[in-house]
Amino acid sequence: DEQTNRSGQLFFKYDHFGLSFRDFDNYLPGKDLRVTIRKGSLSTVNGFFRLQDVTLAAKKDSIRFSTPLISLTGIRIPKNSIYQIGFDRFDLSDGDFSMSWGSDTTILRTESQKDIQLALENVFVDLKKKTFQLGDLQLQTKDIDIPLDNGFYRLKIGGLDLRESGLRLDHVHLVSPYSKMEFAYKQPKHQDWFDVKVGNVRLTDVDIPGYFSTKELHVGGLWINDVLLQNLKNRKIPVEPHIVPMIYEGLQKAPVRFKIDTASIANFSVVYEELPVKGDKPGKLYFTDMNGQFSGLTNIVSYPEQFIRLHADGNLMGSGHFTATWQLPVDSLYDRFLLDARLDSLDL
């Protein structure tokens, strides 16, 4: 009875509580993860939760994460519901992540990411209604280096800055550790060599909270600047005949359903080289100074024969100016694209 605070059974009531601890060192259930915390504190009076010098280490494959500070401020727990919780801000500062592979005695490879800054603002969770509200997500880090395709490529990003519904990536480079002439000999399927450099990528009005409720990502604007795509096909190496997927198939099969209101690409160059069977020097075809505007950039099918439209212009082989409109199908079941192009005089 909450009016009299009397009961025939055990009765417990509280308004606020707090706790603090030091030098925590123990395994999580299952003993696969070990957690060490130098200092921790929680207060519902002040509405904060703070952990200092946190390390999370996995028993297998040497996974390790550490950060000098994890804090949660402005914690709000409604009195009328145990299914709801909110907070003003979550901070994770200067996080370091590393993962090593190898045998019991030898580490063969280690990947790491340092200087991770993560923050969440104005979060409210209702477990009963299964709703999630988020004011802002902030993530900053630099010098990202991710292995791809079993180490035959690495994705390098000089800087990542996500805040206030905007994302910026600087100095993006997809690069292989093998030279373009030896790549196809090293790659098990003898695939073509690629190298892609991007000056920066910028997205605005990224609706992250909306994604959690609709499972669709809505982006206001996308800008891609200063792109150099290089490709070499080595005909000296025989390969099984195969169909090369079209570029738009990657958009259709993307793991995230998305819609981008406006998108553009500026200063885009392509260099295609092909080494013939009976030759020592590759031939070259190149496009430079290309600029393009997208409309209807999405992989969400809304009506039959729906297209993404790309209006572009640039130069072919350094002298032939061209304009083109490329219509790409949104629906994977409609396997047809349309291309309307015009090339001015070309003098080779």
Regions found by a protein language model. Name each.
Residues K186-K189, L348:
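Strand-loop-strand
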Residues L174-E182, L346:
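Surface-exposed extracellular loop regions of Gram-negative outer-membrane beta-barrel proteins
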Residues I237-H242:
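Flexible, surface-exposed loop regions and adjacent strand-edge segments
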